[in-house]
């Protein structure tokens, strides 16, 4: 036996919709089920602010950071090789179809890696904190910067927020999306605006506060959330 798998059984009245989906590695039946997923867990008494980035996946208001896995970047050579093999095959041939399928499988693997990573991290963060704050980023607007678009898509920001909000509901925790304006520029100690370029990685203020740029932003994000909802315990 390689491992175990938990099975959930639902009555036919709970199944609201069934869809047949084709992926690069086969067909899947997707069932939409109406079920209460909420679970009660003990309050942790902790609150945290998260600043997502490209260098680190996120830095929190405690100064801890999670490395960026860069699944797409790490698979770029393999993807280029797969694309090249597709272009070398004659259109309409069986070999070209096989090459296209292999390319699709590679993209599918990256997509699943991203989703699982975002889900794992979000679940861990939510279960460890009673309130989680993050920036209300508009990803579509940010990726208009073509120099950063590939890195931003590879950074899982959208998936991570989606799972934070899902697990927030499931475990009865508070999730707050705050206005991202000035979170990196404002001093988390005195509130002074300290302008800096993207290449400036250290926040240095005249008040004497010197912090990693992302750490400073994460503290500001948490402060903004707490000013909105108060010091909340669930």
Where are these regions (language model features)?
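Positively charged, helix-rich recognition surfaces that bind polyanionic ligands
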Residues: 8-14, 22-234
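Beta-strand/loop nucleic-acid-binding surfaces
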Residues: 2-6
């Amino acid at each position: 036996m390689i491992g175990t798998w938990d099975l959930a059984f639902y009555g036919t009245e709970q199944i609201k919709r069934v869809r047949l989906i084709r992926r690069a590695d086969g067909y899947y039946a997707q069932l939409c089920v109406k079920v209460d997923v909420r679970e009660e867990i003990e309050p942790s008494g902790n609150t945290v602010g998260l600043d997502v980035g490209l260098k680190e996946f996120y830095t929190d208001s405690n100064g801890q950071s999670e490395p960026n896995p860069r699944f797409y970047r790490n698979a770029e050579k393999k993807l280029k090789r797969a694309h090249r093999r597709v272009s070398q095959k004659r259109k309409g041939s069986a070999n070209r179809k096989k090459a296209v399928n292999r390319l699709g499988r590679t993209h599918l693997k990256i997509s699943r890696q991203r989703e699982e990573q975002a889900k794992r991290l979000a679940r861990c963060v939510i279960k460890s904190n009673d309130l989680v704050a993050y920036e209300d980023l508009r990803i579509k607007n940010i990726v208009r910067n073509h120099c950063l678009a590939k890195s931003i898509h590879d950074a899982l920001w959208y998936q991570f927020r989606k799972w934070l909000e899902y697990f927030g509901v499931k475990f009865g925790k508070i999730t707050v999306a705050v206005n991202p304006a000035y979170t990196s520029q404002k001093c988390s100690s005195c509130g002074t605006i300290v302008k800096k370029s993207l290449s400036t990685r250290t926040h240095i203020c005249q008040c004497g506060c010197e912090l990693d740029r992302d750490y400073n932003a994460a503290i500001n994000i948490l402060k903004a959330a707490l000013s909105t909802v108060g010091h909340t315990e669930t």
